[in-house]
């Protein structure tokens, strides 16, 4: 996941979590090693113009995408409230970076090992119920997290944008792997997205599509390294 860049150094920062064979191989690379291809960014740039007060909600590795969005918002003079969620403290990323661009910063962990115990929706609900008003909520993370963030913000009538990260192959819309239903219409995350109005996305369909290759992923993961057994 692309998290940052340095135009002067000509570098891009990516953050990944080992979840399968591909990320396991990526984790073996050392300084000076290379990968065959690196493609991006894809789709349409995130819209941040004109926003004065935004709540950015990030979950897990999705925080790597949420950070540059929060950074861009802060640079434009927007007031940024950030909520990040992780399973445990061990998986926490980009804390100093988020604090540097956030007017308010909240950490939630499933096990309570850091920040407050609970879900990002718990923190967001408290803010909304306390009377906080936002031009927009931007949620980036696991599909189930974004689904429930959108369900919550819909209760309060707050516009919510999400960043979709479905399976992609060619990145041009030709393969159709990243297609989604948004507002009853077919969209492609790689060319029309990745940002969409969360209240218009068919999350159930998106979650079903995400599991299409799970058997093949499990097989490849097992073949790569038996250290993954039981994980």
Where are these regions (language model features)?
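Ferredoxin-reductase
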Residues: 1-31
């Amino acid at each position: 996941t692309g998290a940052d860049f340095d135009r002067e150094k000509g570098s891009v920062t990516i953050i990944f979590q080992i979840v399968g064979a591909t990320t396991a191989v990526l984790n073996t690379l050392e300084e000076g090693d290379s990968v065959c291809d690196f493609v991006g960014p894809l789709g349409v740039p995130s819209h941040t113009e004109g926003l004065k007060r935004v709540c950015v909600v990030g979950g897990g590795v999705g925080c790597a995408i949420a950070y540059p969005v929060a950074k861009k918002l802060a640079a434009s003079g927007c007031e940024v409230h950030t909520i990040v969620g992780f399973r445990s403290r061990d998986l926490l990323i980009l804390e100093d970076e988020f604090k540097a661009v956030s007017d308010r910063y909240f950490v939630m962990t499933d096990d309570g090992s850091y920040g407050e115990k609970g879900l990002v929706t718990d923190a967001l609900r408290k803010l909304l119920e306390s009377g906080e008003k936002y031009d927009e909520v931007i949620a980036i993370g696991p599909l189930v997290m974004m689904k429930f963030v959108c369900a919550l913000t819909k209760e309060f009538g707050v516009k919510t944008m999400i960043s979709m990260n479905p399976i992609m192959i060619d990145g041009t819309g030709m393969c159709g792997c990243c297609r989604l239903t948004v507002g009853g219409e077919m969209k492609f995350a790689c060319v029309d997205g990745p940002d969409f109005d969360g209240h218009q996305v068919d999350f159930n369909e998106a979650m079903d599509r995400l599991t299409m290759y799970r058997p093949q992923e499990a097989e490849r993961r097992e073949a790569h390294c038996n250290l993954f057994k039981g994980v």
